[in-house]
Swiss-Prot record:
Family: Belongs to the ClpA/ClpB family.
Organism field: Arabidopsis thaliana (Mouse-ear cress)
Transit peptide: first to last position: 1-67
SMART domains according to UniProt: AAA (SM00382), ClpB_D2-small (SM01086)
Name of the protein: Chaperone protein ClpB3, chloroplastic
Any one GO molecular-function label of the UniProt entry: ATP binding
Length: 968
């Protein structure tokens, strides 16, 4: 037997004489293997005629091999003269004959083998003509079923005369078309003159030889069969690409709003003589692919220069091109076929490669050329017009490393659109999303989607994240509409529950059960009436909405037909549709909308059918975890109440809080420079007076979460080289890929409060980074990315000059004005910080030491936090003014501010409460009164004031709880 690398030859020979009649016997026979095709088809195992012993005995008692001249040249049918798909069908045809118990392999068996090939060329040819392949296969099978059958091993062992003649005709077609191998299309053409089966089949399906040739020509293009796998290269663009212009013509692409400058620049580059290849570079989600779709729509509408008129824009699918390429060189063959089709079109086809960085290195194994190197010559000479799209990071990582490839592309930067532009884009897409989901989308929802996504969803880019919000909100509403309403669902469950109860009571005979049964039956009648009413109402509402959606879909289809008619200058058809069908549909739509609106306004409606701003806020809340109520609070309300909200958390420091609130209000009203941060402050004062607390309060109120506070401790930046930690390590150093501590945080969360704590402790060179942040609102990180600080509030804290504040006695502090103290502190700051740094800070705010009264207020704030923690045990703390005064006096120290208060409360309140709970003195739902008492004079010790903890009687506690609930 032949090995996998050798091939067997099927030979047919001999004329056998029986009496006066001469008969030609056709049989497959294993001869000496030759190097053409693997000798493993199962149907060729019976090639020796010892398996046809009965036939041999009839002719001659001597054993011999029957042969027949089936080939005009060497008497052999070899794989070398056929393409792989053609040979596969020839090898499969004996199997078809064997399955149908037929001895002679004929043309109908070959036709069935051709039609059963997955993605076969024969199927593509018939589809091109407009013939249903399934029906052709059914007709072939019917013909096969009518042929005589034989039983035994002889099935499928002989080659028919008509099949032999078909091979001869196929060879002739190969010569006529100047091909090197007999391919599937030659075999299909040969069926046109097949007197046994093919001619009648083609006649039944009205297939002529001319239509076959034109279909083959459109599939093959200008290609010739020069290797044994040409079928895989036919219509390569159709197989591995999507025609964007065809999709635009059919209305399958979403409208592209704006982006006129980028599309115009692409057209400009495509119109060049050489290097006419734009590459769209931008962050993911900014609309790079949409620009190519916008160009396709313009080509279809004829809104392009003559150089691009009637061109085809094909999007190449690199995944499909690489997938399934098992052997070395197969991927390159596919790509070459695609490129050949593009170049043969003589500029009629423009290629669009999304994620073009995948081309670099694609297909390269063990020194083989990658796809990028195959593209370079064509890109440089202008033979291939290609539009690429990739992100900034991937462009830098892959394409910039290959300068020869990079210089063949012209860069087109695609920036993130503004919030206003995003709203325009959403308005343009609204109709498509309304049509898909079958709901209405309000304009307020679109505005909310753009604003909230920009403010709260970091790490993603507009318009993609805003479109996703609208899409998800519409999907959520659609799900609510299609599922059963809550009221009806509860009613159904009540009916089922009562039905089960009625069944269980049916067999009980006692009086109570009977009465209960009667009550249940009465209740069931009422519930079922209500259920039927609600079900009818729900079905009616759904039917109105589905009718509305079907009318909208019909209007969309008619609009598409009008556009096509106008493009083809069929003005009669366009006018008929526009003033006939469209007007009629518009009237129906208005009537249906009026009916639905009346139904909704009547108050009977069981669900909403419009996406509102609250729906968008709910989705943002799900994505980010920020409470919905805070998301929906308007910006204006926040700004108006900013000062009083800050005072709730920051005790005293009126000048500081007022200055911060005014700076924020000024910025948000649009009176500040849009190219700078919202505001920049330098908080100066002694420790523990509320500098960091004010920054936390501002972040929490402005951006709805304390996590929006980015705190950077400047004591970690005391060395000169530490500045690289802020903006990222330079190339070649450890941590280059990770980015900077400051820049990465702001890129991920652009709306934030940045707190640089203890700024005077940083090295002098660190301040050089702050200069451009404070002045231009941006900084360039180590990887060349520009990070914007225009939506941040920058706060720096410093203890510089605190000695001037603390050294004043209470009397002096009253005499000295705030401005005098501030002037002294500023002079101290000027001696430390450079003038160019100080000149860029918006406002310097000096914090004064806290007095006794303010410390007492802080005590109450800290005790409120203790109360929150102990509330889990359902306990309540009541504290007297005397106890607050005592804690205030214990925690008061002008040099340390409010920080000692926390320690005093921990030692005197929390420790005692913990001991009382562990001893069992205080239990759940107990009220605890914290008061003071004066100790008696004993053992020479003076009387002292100390805290006492008493358990309040339960009645008193209950009364207090009731009073508190009533007041709430």
């Amino acid at each position: 037997m032949a090995t996998a690398t050798t091939t067997a030859t099927a030979a047919f020979s001999g004329v056998v004489s029986v009496g006066t009649e001469t008969r030609r016997i056709y049989s497959f026979s294993h001869l000496q293997p030759s190097a053409a095709f693997p000798a493993k088809p199962s149907s060729f195992k019976s090639l020796k005629l010892k398996q046809s012993a009965r036939l041999t005995r009839r002719l001659d008692h001597r054993p011999f091999v029957v042969r027949c001249e089936a080939s005009s040249s060497n008497g052999r049918l070899t794989q070398q003269e056929f393409t792989e798909m053609a040979w596969q069908s020839i090898v499969s045809s004996p199997d078809v004959a064997k399955e149908n118990k037929q001895q002679i392999v004929e043309t109908e068996h070959l036709m069935k083998a051709l039609l059963e090939q997955k993605n076969g060329l024969a199927r593509r040819i018939f589809s091109k003509i407009g013939v249903d392949n399934t029906k052709v296969l059914e007709a072939t099978e019917k013909f096969i079923q009518r042929q005589p059958k034989v039983y035994g091993d002889a099935a499928g062992s002989m080659l028919g005369r008509d099949l032999e003649a078909l091979f001869q005709r196929a060879r002739q077609f190969k010569k006529d078309l100047k091909d090197s191998y007999v391919s599937v299309e030659h075999l299909v053409l040969a069926f046109a003159d097949d007197k046994r089966f093919g001619k009648q089949l083609f006649k039944d399906f009205q297939i002529s030889e001319r239509s076959l040739k034109s279909a083959i020509e459109s599939i093959r293009g200008k290609q010739s069969v020069i290797d044994q796998d040409p079928e895989g290269k036919y219509e390569a663009l159709e197989k591995y690409g999507k025609d964007l212009t065809a999709m635009a013509r059919e209305g399958k692409l979403d409208p592209v709003i704006g982006r006129d400058d980028e599309i115009r620049r692409c057209i400009q580059i495509l119109s060049r003589r050489t290097k006419n290849n734009p590459v769209l570079i931008g962050e993911p989600g900014v609309g790079k692919t949409a620009i190519s779709e916008g160009l396709a729509q313009r080509i279809v509408q004829g809104d392009v220069p003559q150089a691009l008129m009637n061109r085809k824009l094909i999007s190449l699918d690199m995944g499909a091109l690489i997938a399934g390429a098992k052997y070395r060189g197969e991927f390159e063959d596919r790509l070459k076929a695609v490129l050949k089709e593009v170049t043969d079109s003589e500029g009629q086809i423009i290629l669009f490669i999304d994620e073009i960085h995948t081309v670099v290195g694609a297909g390269a194994t063990n020194g083989a050329m990658d796809a990028g190197n195959l593209l370079k010559p064509m890109l440089g000479r202008g033979e291939l017009r290609c539009i690429g799209a990739t992100t900034l990071d991937e462009y830098r990582k892959y394409i910039e490393k290959d300068p020869a490839l990079e210089r063949r592309f012209q860069q087109v930067y695609v920036d993130q659109p503004t919030v206003e532009d995003t709203i325009s884009i959403l308005r343009g897409l609204r109709e498509r999303y309304e049509l898909h989901h079958g709901v209405r989308i309000s304009d307020s929802a679109l505005v909310e989607a753009a604003i909230l996504s920009d403010r709260y969803i970091s790490g993603r880019f507009l318009p993609d994240k805003a479109i996703d919000l609208v899409d998800e909100a519409a999907a959520k509403l659609k799900m609510e509409i299609t599922s059963k309403p809550t009221a009806l669902d509860e009613l159904d469950r009540s009916v089922i529950k009562l039905e089960m109860e009625r069944l269980s009571l049916t067999n009980d005979t006692d009086k109570a059960s009977r009465e209960r049964l009667n009550r249940i039956e009465t209740e069931l009648v009422l519930l079922k009436e209500k259920q039927a009413e609600l079900t009818e109402q729900w079905e009616h509402e759904r039917s109105v909405m589905s009718r509305l959606q079907s009318i909208k879909e019909e209007i969309d289809r008619v609009n598409l037909e009008i556009q096509q008619a106008e493009r083809e200058y069929d003005l009669n058809r366009a006018a008929e549709l526009k003033y006939g069908s469209l007007n009629s549909l518009q009237r129906q739509l208005n009537e249906a909308e009026k009916e639905l609106n009346e139904y909704l306004s009547s108050g009977k409606s069981m669900f909403r059918e419009e996406v509102l701003g609250s729906d968008i806020a709910e989705i943002v809340s799900k994505w980010t975890g920020i409470p919905v109520s805070k998301l929906q609070q308007s910006e204006r309300d926040k700004l108006l109440h900013l000062e009083e909200e800050l005072h709730k958390r920051v005790v005293g420091q009126n000048p500081a809080v007022t200055a911060v609130a005014e700076a924020i209000q000024r910025s948000r009203a649009g009176l500040s420079d849009p190219g700078r941060p919202i505001a920049s402050f330098m908080f100066m004062g002694p420790t523990g007076v509320g500098k960091t607390e004010l920054a936390k309060a501002l972040a929490s109120y402005m951006f709805n979460t304390e996590e929006a506070l980015v705190r950077i401790d400047m004591s970690e930046y005391m060395e000169k080289h530490a500045v690289s930690r802020l903006i990222g390590a330079p190339p070649g150093y450890v941590g280059y890929e990770e980015g900077g501590q400051l820049t990465e945080t702001v890129r991920r969360r652009p709306y934030s409060v940045i707190l640089f704590d203890e700024i005077e402790k940083a090295h002098g060179d660190v301040f050089n980074v702050f200069l451009q942040i404070l002045d231009d609102g941006r900084v360039t990180d180590s990887q060349g990315r520009t990070v914007s600080f225009t939506n941040t509030v920058i706060i720096m804290t410093s203890n510089v000059g605190s000695q001037f504040i603390l050294n004043n006695t209470d009397d002096d502090a009253n005499e000295l004005s705030y401005e005098t103290i501030k002037e002294r502190v500023m002079n101290a700051a000027r001696s430390i910080f450079r003038p160019e740094f100080m000149n860029r800070v918006d406002e310097y705010i000096v914090f004064k030491p806290l007095d006794r009264e303010q410390i007492n207020r802080i005590v109450r704030l800290q005790l409120a936090r203790v109360q929150k923690r102990i509330a889990d045990r359902k306990m309540k703390i009541n504290i007297t003014d005397a106890a607050v005064d005592l804690l205030g006096s214990l925690g008061y120290d002008p040099n340390y501010g409010a920080r000692p208060v926390k320690r005093v409360i921990q030692q005197n309140i929390e420790n005692e409460l913990a001991k009382g709970i562990l001893r069992g003195d205080f239990k759940e739902e107990d009220g605890i009164l914290i008061d003071t008492e004066v100790t008696a004079f004993s053992n020479g010790q003076l009387p002292q004031q100390k805290l006492t903890f008493k358990k309040i009687e339960s009645e008193t506690a209950d009364a207090e709880q009731e009073e508190a609930a009533f007041s709430k």
